[in-house]
Amino acid sequence: MREIELWTAVLAGVVQGITEWLPISSEGQATMTMMKVLGIPPSTAMDLALWLHAGTLLAVLLRFGVPYWLTVRDLLMGGPWRRLGLFAIVATVCTAVVGLPVYKVLKGIFSAATGDAVQMAIGGALIVTGLLLRISPEGLRDRREVNVVDAVIVGLGQGFSVIPGISRSGTTMALLLWRRFDGGEAVWLSFYLAGPAMLGATALELKEGLSAATKMGTSWMVTAIGVSFVVSLICMEVLLRVARRLDFSKVCLLLGGIALLVPLAAKML
C-alpha cells in the first residue's frame, strides 16, 4: 500500500472511530471525508462509510461484551437484564422497519447527487441534531426503568440515522433525554444499542460494501477498520467517563454550520 493510501485509510478510520460516539454523524463525516479527500463518488463513499462500522462494531462488542452476555442469559433464563434485552429487541426491530426503506430510497437520491449538495444536506441534518439536543429536557430515570414506549420511540428515531448527517448516537441520546433519562444513562443506553444497530448496518450494505472495498484494496480496508476499532475503544471509555460534562449540541451546530457554509463560500469565490 502506498503511503498516501495508508494515510487516507488511517484518516477514514479515525473519523469513523471518533464520530460514531459523538452526536455527529459518523456516516456523514466519513462520507464527506472520503468525497473531499479521496474524490470518491457520493454513493460509493456512502457504501464505504457504512462498511467502516465493522471496526466500531468490534469495539462495542468488546467494551459491552459483559452487558450483552448478561442480557442474552437473562432473556433465556430470566433476571434483571431481561428488561434491557426486551428494550434492545423492540428498538432494533423498529429501527429496521424505518431504516431499511429509508436507506433504499436514499441510496438512489445520493447516487445522483453532487458532492456539494450532499455536504450541504449533511450540514442541515447536523444542525437539526444539534437543535434536538439543546431542547431535550434532562431527567432522572436510569437504565433499569426502560419500557416498550422508550424502545419504540428510540428505535424509530434511530432508523433515520442511516441518512448521512443524521447522528445515530445524537438521535438516541436526544430522545432518551426527552424521555427524562439521566444524561450519563442516555449515553450508556445509546452505546448499548449501537451493537445491534451497527450489525444491521454492516449486513445491510455487505454486498455493495465489499464491492467498494475491493476498489480501495484489502489493505486499505483492513487498515481503516483496524484504526476505527482502536479509536472507538478509546473514545467510548472517555465519553462514558465525562458524559455529564460535554455539550454535544454545540459540536453539532458548529460542524453543521461549517458543512453548510463551505460549499456556499466556494461558489462565491
Curated annotation (Swiss-Prot):
Q: Which residues cross the membrane?
A: 4-24, 50-70, 86-106, 113-133, 146-166, 186-206, 220-240, 246-266
Can you name one GO molecular function term for this protein? Answer: undecaprenyl-diphosphatase activity
Domain of life, per lineage: Archaea
The catalytic activity, as recorded, is:
di-trans,octa-cis-undecaprenyl diphosphate + H2O = di-trans,octa-cis-undecaprenyl phosphate + phosphate + H(+)
**Which locations, inside or outside the cell, does it occupy?**
Cell membrane
| Annotated membrane topology | Multi-pass membrane protein
GO cellular component terms, A-Z: plasma membrane
Which terms are listed as keywords in the entry? Answer: Cell membrane, Hydrolase, Membrane, Transmembrane, Transmembrane helix
Its Enzyme Commission number(s) read: 3.6.1.27
Keyword NAD in annotation: no
The disulfides recorded in the entry are: none
Cross-referenced InterPro entries: UppP
Q: What is its main location?
A: membrane
Family recorded in the similarity comment = Belongs to the UppP family.
Q: Which PANTHER family match?
A: UNDECAPRENYL-DIPHOSPHATASE
Function of the protein:
Catalyzes the dephosphorylation of undecaprenyl diphosphate (UPP).
UniProt protein name: Undecaprenyl-diphosphatase
Q: Give the organism the record lists.
A: Methanopyrus kandleri (strain AV19 / DSM 6324 / JCM 9639 / NBRC 100938)
Q: Which gene encodes it?
A: uppP
